[in-house]
């Protein structure tokens, strides 16, 4: 068995812990200190919409026994990766055309690399986090951690039998903190678990594991409960501008800071509940899970970007963009966002698709994912209405004689197709009858 994963607490050694300030990591940090480890706490500022005071988290870690505690601002990098995902269409999970924007995988890519980089600065080469053995994050953090520090060792209290035996549940952890002089009041248990960052929120587990429990039990943290009749949502016109694939302006206001742009996009989309979806997905280990997601800003930018893609690029380029995006989305989900095959797909889209995306899209947002596109403008549009106008136009690009020639050339593949269908009929692959959708194939001429 690999010695990369430590199954017992490394006493006397520095252990970095991804510290959220919640019950689990608070109890784990105190327990590790009491059992002889030297814990270092690292907190990622990912712009979580449900976090009120980031600066209080490192202070809390020091109270629980951390040797040192640092707050790492990851927002700029997260915004950068979010834009890269939009540029490359790195989204592979959707239901009925409603997309999940891989916001948790993007957050893990940033957290896993930036926290381990900070640990290296402190000569901390053992890392622990709160991910469980059934989820995706245990593998994502494992990959990103070892990519960033090849000498990294992994210690997770939740894989340590001694920790589980002593502090195996929320009640035990709460009692442990109280017994050690900390006034910890357990929060009221929600009917589901929430994880969030600046790009989006994930609601899953507990009651949401049952498919007969839906979005109506969720209290959005980035938007409104648009499905409720008592929630007023007014229609709103919104304009989004891109320059060379980069979102630069919302409603005429230019943003040089991508973090501020995402925050404003979240506010705009959130007023309507835009970007919420209910998805059944395949986890990395191939078992299916269910999540309800929020991503108002990502959805807003994605709509505008894809509208410009469809108006600027040709059919084959769009097809390749979509195929590559599906593959890239899956790699991102699996924790492979910085693997060579993912970088290849990303750079292809960013170079050959995104660089041409300059323009402005105006649309009307209503409730949830209900919207209408009102206008599309770009100096790079290849959509030219005069080419296919139903009215008579001067200097038409082609005339009836040209189309006759084009149709005549189609005779070649039509004849070939008919011959192939005849072969399939003779071999029994197709059955010809009066009720068949191809009843005339057995007739000559």
Swiss-Prot record:
<dbReference type="GO" id="GO:0005524">
    <property type="term" value="F:ATP binding"/>
</dbReference>
<protein>
    <recommendedName>
        <fullName>Argininosuccinate synthase</fullName>
        <ecNumber>6.3.4.5</ecNumber>
    </recommendedName>
</protein>
<dbReference type="GO" id="GO:0006526">
    <property type="term" value="P:L-arginine biosynthetic process"/>
</dbReference>
<feature type="binding site">
    <location>
        <position position="100"/>
    </location>
    <ligand>
        <name>L-citrulline</name>
    </ligand>
</feature>
<feature type="binding site">
    <location>
        <position position="195"/>
    </location>
    <ligand>
        <name>ATP</name>
    </ligand>
</feature>
<feature type="binding site">
    <location>
        <position position="202"/>
    </location>
    <ligand>
        <name>L-citrulline</name>
    </ligand>
</feature>
<feature type="binding site">
    <location>
        <position position="132"/>
    </location>
    <ligand>
        <name>L-aspartate</name>
    </ligand>
</feature>
<feature type="binding site">
    <location>
        <position position="137"/>
    </location>
    <ligand>
        <name>ATP</name>
    </ligand>
</feature>
<dbReference type="InterPro" id="IPR048268">
    <property type="entry name" value="Arginosuc_syn_C"/>
</dbReference>
<keyword id="KW-0055">Arginine biosynthesis</keyword>
<dbReference type="InterPro" id="IPR001518">
    <property type="entry name" value="Arginosuc_synth"/>
</dbReference>
<feature type="binding site">
    <location>
        <position position="136"/>
    </location>
    <ligand>
        <name>L-citrulline</name>
    </ligand>
</feature>
<dbReference type="GO" id="GO:0000050">
    <property type="term" value="P:urea cycle"/>
</dbReference>
<comment type="subunit">
    <text>Homotetramer.</text>
</comment>
<dbReference type="GO" id="GO:0004055">
    <property type="term" value="F:argininosuccinate synthase activity"/>
</dbReference>
<dbReference type="InterPro" id="IPR024074">
    <property type="entry name" value="AS_cat/multimer_dom_body"/>
</dbReference>
<dbReference type="Pfam" id="PF20979">
    <property type="entry name" value="Arginosuc_syn_C"/>
</dbReference>
<comment type="pathway">
    <text>Amino-acid biosynthesis; L-arginine biosynthesis; L-arginine from L-ornithine and carbamoyl phosphate: step 2/3.</text>
</comment>
<feature type="binding site">
    <location>
        <position position="204"/>
    </location>
    <ligand>
        <name>L-citrulline</name>
    </ligand>
</feature>
<dbReference type="InterPro" id="IPR024073">
    <property type="entry name" value="AS_multimer_C_tail"/>
</dbReference>
<keyword id="KW-0436">Ligase</keyword>
<feature type="binding site">
    <location>
        <position position="193"/>
    </location>
    <ligand>
        <name>L-citrulline</name>
    </ligand>
</feature>
<feature type="binding site">
    <location>
        <position position="136"/>
    </location>
    <ligand>
        <name>L-aspartate</name>
    </ligand>
</feature>
<dbReference type="GO" id="GO:0005737">
    <property type="term" value="C:cytoplasm"/>
</dbReference>
<dbReference type="Pfam" id="PF00764">
    <property type="entry name" value="Arginosuc_synth"/>
</dbReference>
<dbReference type="InterPro" id="IPR023434">
    <property type="entry name" value="Arginosuc_synth_type_1_subfam"/>
</dbReference>
<keyword id="KW-0067">ATP-binding</keyword>
<feature type="binding site">
    <location>
        <position position="44"/>
    </location>
    <ligand>
        <name>ATP</name>
    </ligand>
</feature>
<keyword id="KW-0963">Cytoplasm</keyword>
<feature type="binding site">
    <location>
        <begin position="18"/>
        <end position="26"/>
    </location>
    <ligand>
        <name>ATP</name>
    </ligand>
</feature>
<dbReference type="GO" id="GO:0000053">
    <property type="term" value="P:argininosuccinate metabolic process"/>
</dbReference>
<keyword id="KW-0028">Amino-acid biosynthesis</keyword>
<feature type="binding site">
    <location>
        <position position="130"/>
    </location>
    <ligand>
        <name>ATP</name>
    </ligand>
</feature>
<keyword id="KW-0547">Nucleotide-binding</keyword>
<feature type="binding site">
    <location>
        <position position="132"/>
    </location>
    <ligand>
        <name>ATP</name>
    </ligand>
</feature>
<feature type="binding site">
    <location>
        <position position="281"/>
    </location>
    <ligand>
        <name>L-citrulline</name>
    </ligand>
</feature>
<comment type="similarity">
    <text>Belongs to the argininosuccinate synthase family. Type 2 subfamily.</text>
</comment>
<feature type="binding site">
    <location>
        <position position="137"/>
    </location>
    <ligand>
        <name>L-aspartate</name>
    </ligand>
</feature>
<dbReference type="InterPro" id="IPR023437">
    <property type="entry name" value="Arg_succ_synth_type2_subfam"/>
</dbReference>
<dbReference type="InterPro" id="IPR048267">
    <property type="entry name" value="Arginosuc_syn_N"/>
</dbReference>
<feature type="binding site">
    <location>
        <position position="140"/>
    </location>
    <ligand>
        <name>L-citrulline</name>
    </ligand>
</feature>
<dbReference type="InterPro" id="IPR018223">
    <property type="entry name" value="Arginosuc_synth_CS"/>
</dbReference>
